[in-house]
Amino acid sequence: MIMKHWILTLACLVLFTENRDTLLSATAQNARPHILFAIADDWSYGHASAYGCSWVETPAFDRLAREGLLFDHAYTPNAKCAPSRATILTGRYSWQLEEAANHVCPFPPKFGGFMERLSAGGYQTGYTGKGWGPGTAKDVSGKPRLITGKAYQGAKRRPKASGISHNDYASNFETFLNEQKPGQPWAFWYGTTEPHRGYEYGSGVRLGKKLNQIDRVPAYWPDNDITRNDMLDYAIEVEHYDHHLERILSLLEERGLLDQTLVVATSDHGMPFPRVKGQAYLHSNHVPLAIRWPDGIQGSGRRIADFVNFTDLAPTFLEAAGIQSPGPIMQAMSGHSLFDIFKASGSGQINPERNRVLVGKERHDIGRPNDWGYPIRGILTSDWLYLHNFEPARWPAGNPETGYLNCDGSPLKTQILEARRKGLSTASWELSFGKRPEEELYHVAMDEDCMNNLAESTEHQETSTRLKDLMQRDLLQHQDPRMLGKGDVFDSYPFVNESNVHFYERYMSGERPRTGWVHPSDFEAAALE
């Protein structure tokens, strides 16, 4: 009898334990937050009313900051669409992603992204607008990957300016939301194509903005009506992103889902203007970032001074979802979850080890001989930006005779080029398009526009050497091919479009392949020295 009683008791304990584990598993499943990732296309840090900007109004972004966290030092490691978004998805630096380090590239199937990992972990995933790209993402069998989830692009709406997409992003999100079952965790990528160019010139003023609202024009551009109009047209498109974000937040709130959702709002890199997008200066890589998640973040209205970068987002999303391992879909991640910041209290510097970020680039847009890129690596701290240009003999924004193709066409670009051609001014041209020395050093605490290169100053040699050594140490830990003497591999990787291959040589021989992102007048009549 005693033995039977013991066996019965043991059986009950086993059954209880199994049921308890089932209940805990179910509880964990229900507790996992929904995830909304809201990413603009070419939106610079500081251009939100939460940051004190007077000429861009962003009530939705401001709400996230007010009810969550606002970051002052968030960065993309690579300021171009495809490599920046690849970094977000994988949690790895672009120089760790082989072909995906480049722009308009194939995305190697061995590098899975967080949306694919969330899907495998029980999340329903979808996106509207722009996901990853430009490029192609296929699995090992050649089938398209759902790299940012299922596409929701059907709803259209007439925008208030002709340069803005007709995509009704918020309505497309609502379609996705209507398909979800109660208790089912989901992750949605809301990606606008705004404020990417082109713009309707003068739309900012037409819609009520004034040129004198802009309190500061960067020192590397001419301060005139053309520049200010261009900036206000950009502002209208930032506000379009924010308007749809506001509609999405309202929809979640109406359905009682907002507080159960981890919301992250940011941009892939800086604004599509000369010397910003596609470069490696402070304004190129510095991005806005606000995060709201009442169930997972301690306190609200906190302003964070820690240096964080896009490699940190994927590990954050996986930790929030209770996914302990990125594999086998994802490779090991280089970033660090933001949960140390989430679980702390107060503002300012939370983790003293988050005191620097790495930046860099390889091949972006076409237009140089031999399909060359313009390789850079750099390191940024609260005081300093150090940059190493590996090929200073090359043109940083692309060759002049092929239209400076790594800089989008714009009224501002046109006036800078025309000022040089007419002999009126070369200052902005030199800063935006001219060749650069091998090393650059800027005291960004005092010179955020990166106007005064201190690299050749004997007074600052110790600073340059210290930062270069620290950068190289970090890059060696990443097994960066540039640090291993194998940097040429990046220029050998294929394009996804045959029309891009040997563009420079074909153009110089008389072909005229399509280059719709620049203006015909961007092309110089002859090569420049």
Predicted regions and their residues:
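Short, low-complexity interaction segments enriched in Ser/Thr/Pro/Gly
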Residues: 1, 15-16, 358
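Short, basic/polar N-terminal leader/transit segment immediately after the initiator methionine
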Residues: 3-8, 491-495
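Formylglycine-dependent sulfatase
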Residues: 4, 22-440, 448-469, 473, ...
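Bacterial N-terminal signal peptides
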Residues: 7-18
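Short arginine-rich
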Residues: 475-479
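Short, charged, surface-exposed hinge/linker loops at domain edges
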Residues: 483-498
